[in-house]
Amino acid sequence: MSEWSRIAVEFGEQQLNLTELEDFARELAYEGLDPALIIKKLKETGGDDWVKDTKFIIVFALTRGNKIVKASGKMSNSGSKRLMALQEKYGLVERAETRLSITPVRVAQSLPTWTCAAAAALKEYLPVGPAVMNLKVENYPPEMMCMAFGSLIPTAGVSEATTKTLMEAYSLWQDAFTKTINVKMRGASKTEVYNSFRDPLHAAVNSVFFPNDVRVKWLKAKGILGPDGVPSRAAEVAAAAYRNL
């Protein structure tokens, strides 16, 4: 046995330290955005107008996405002027290059309860709304029809099975949305599509920014979870539909 072979064998005898491994994994985990920094920038920049401005940005994200320049040329003159003014005011960008980049979608993801409630109210304006989802399953929860719902899936206060069911139910919309906005994905396999949104989804679900107790309370209020914390029938059906894709 060579010296290097011996070292490899001895390395394999190192005891696994679960705490150390989990610390490494957390340090290396996908981190797409920092909601606290985004909200701080919005509030400090916007002053008294930050809430109204932010709601406008979120509705834009829900209905048009991140393509500010392209979308501004295909809307009312007043809407275009307001959008471009907000882009300059808050430094909005169309593509997130760093954790500090502020895109319309990131603004929406940073404020998930308001965003998801707005999605349910604006459902007919969504790029992938009830007209699409109700062809897949009946009564698909409208709050799930947006990019912010992952931040509301709890990892505490409910069973692991409940977390898994909600992630699968939400993935049904994510699959449809990905294929809608990305032409290259329309012929892709379920696994390929899932891999395209897997990391951001898991990052949102596992984020500690939005408290789990607030997530559970909100989901119960919307009927997505029952009083006992069990997923609604609609969520269960949606999860099954995703598994069967």
Swiss-Prot record:
GO molecular function (one): RNA binding
Keyword Coiled coil appears in the UniProt entry: no
UniProt site (RNA-binding): 64, 67, 70, 95, 106, 184
Record GO cellular component, one term: ribonucleoprotein complex
Keywords on record: Capsid protein, Host cytoplasm, Host Golgi apparatus, Host nucleus, Ribonucleoprotein, RNA-binding, Viral nucleoprotein, Virion
Residues where RNA binds: 30, 67, 106, 186, 196
Location(s) in or outside the cell: Virion; Host cytoplasm; Host nucleus; Host endoplasmic reticulum-Golgi intermediate compartment
Primary location class: virion
Domain notes: The N-terminus is involved in homooligomerization.
Similarity comment text for this entry: Belongs to the phlebovirus nucleocapsid protein family.
Its job: Encapsidates the genomic RNA, protecting it from nucleases. Displays high affinity for single-stranded nucleic acid. The encapsidated genomic RNA is termed the nucleocapsid (NC) or ribonucleoprotein. The ribonucleoprotein has a non-helical structure. Serves as template for viral transcription and replication. After replication, the nucleocapsid is recruited to the host Golgi apparatus by glycoprotein Gn for packaging into virus particles.
Note: Binds suramin, which inhibits the replication of SFTSV in vitro.
Subunit structure and binding partners: Homodimer. Homohexamer; ring-shaped, necessary to form the nucleocapsid. Homopentamers; opened pentamers in solution. Binds to viral genomic RNA. Interacts with glycoprotein Gn; this interaction allows packaging of nucleocapsids into virions.
Protein's UniProt name: Nucleoprotein
Gene: NP
